[in-house]
């Protein structure tokens, strides 16, 4: 992984009055570009081939310029060009997936957030160690598939967007569906309501909901719409579907907004706080936007089954603010909050605390 010192050397040659915010044209890029423009930054969209035409339909979120690459791996050959334009990269889930975690870790361009989180986020066993170390309640983990005696969720390492997930109730079902060439995790299937909680951790603000270092914000929350799981049971009972050879899949196709009972907010903040505090000790902190992927049970317990350590697509619901973000600042999206953090870090001469 590129070192923090190397990144700081690059920043010495930056014109900090003319920073360009850049990301790959996908995932949450519209929101990122819109938020950056609202905070006075130039924007750059990175794309393979011709720029997507749909950006013409959204002029407020259309990037000021494009970097055209032959492939996503080709971004690694454009790092000098990016640095000459004072670029700070905003990583989102698709950016990391398309470029590859190894390339992303080595990319010689200043990047918002702490790249050290990749090691802990992409390995499900390390992710579990992190969350359990923070005192987070997680679904039970089953090490031997022969011990399956009820519904379980099976996830392959690195699976995102719902791909690579399946549910099994017996070892026989597991054995029929599993791809043993991939590394997988078996988790207890928790019944309840799924909530995806969108937080923002700032190491440079010391107001509001403060932690041992910096402060924590809750910006929004959502639930994912999944195909075909959300509609499949209109066709019959689970048993009838299985007999017909139809099994649910969990590919994310969109998102719907949610708010939580106000009485749950103390627990929601506590979860975010514990995860951040644990990250500070493990790898120097998870900076900026992150999401805890949870299930709220009928006993009002919150179980966390995964973490995403950067902006998630569910925040796209709230480009003009959310019921929570509106209580911090009007018209505050996660994309705009990222731009504010960079702007504030430049003003305070603390960019070293938020980039890697």
From Swiss-Prot:
Keywords: ATP-binding, Ligase, Magnesium, Manganese, Metal-binding, Nucleotide-binding, Purine biosynthesis. One of its GO terms (biological process) is 'de novo' IMP biosynthetic process. Binds 1 Mg(2+) or Mn(2+) ion per subunit. Pathway: Purine metabolism; IMP biosynthesis via de novo pathway; 5-formamido-1-(5-phospho-D-ribosyl)imidazole-4-carboxamide from 5-amino-1-(5-phospho-D-ribosyl)imidazole-4-carboxamide (formate route): step 1/1. Residues 101-333 form the ATP-grasp domain. GO terms for molecular function: ATP binding; ligase activity, forming carbon-nitrogen bonds; magnesium ion binding. Its cofactor is Mg(2+); Mn(2+). It is an enzyme of class 6 (ligase). 5-amino-1-(5-phospho-beta-D-ribosyl)imidazole-4-carboxamide binds at residues 27, 94, 255. Its EC number is 6.3.4.23. It catalyses: 5-amino-1-(5-phospho-beta-D-ribosyl)imidazole-4-carboxamide + formate + ATP = 5-formamido-1-(5-phospho-D-ribosyl)imidazole-4-carboxamide + ADP + phosphate. ATP binds at residues 145-196, 226. Mg(2+) binds at residues 293, 306. HAMAP family: IMP_biosynth_PurP. NCBIfam families: PRK13278.1-6. Belongs to the phosphohexose mutase family. Catalyzes the ATP- and formate-dependent formylation of 5-aminoimidazole-4-carboxamide-1-beta-d-ribofuranosyl 5'-monophosphate (AICAR) to 5-formaminoimidazole-4-carboxamide-1-beta-d-ribofuranosyl 5'-monophosphate (FAICAR) in the absence of folates. This is 5-formaminoimidazole-4-carboxamide-1-(beta)-D-ribofuranosyl 5'-monophosphate synthetase 1. It comes from Methanosarcina mazei (strain ATCC BAA-159 / DSM 3647 / Goe1 / Go1 / JCM 11833 / OCM 88) (Methanosarcina frisia).
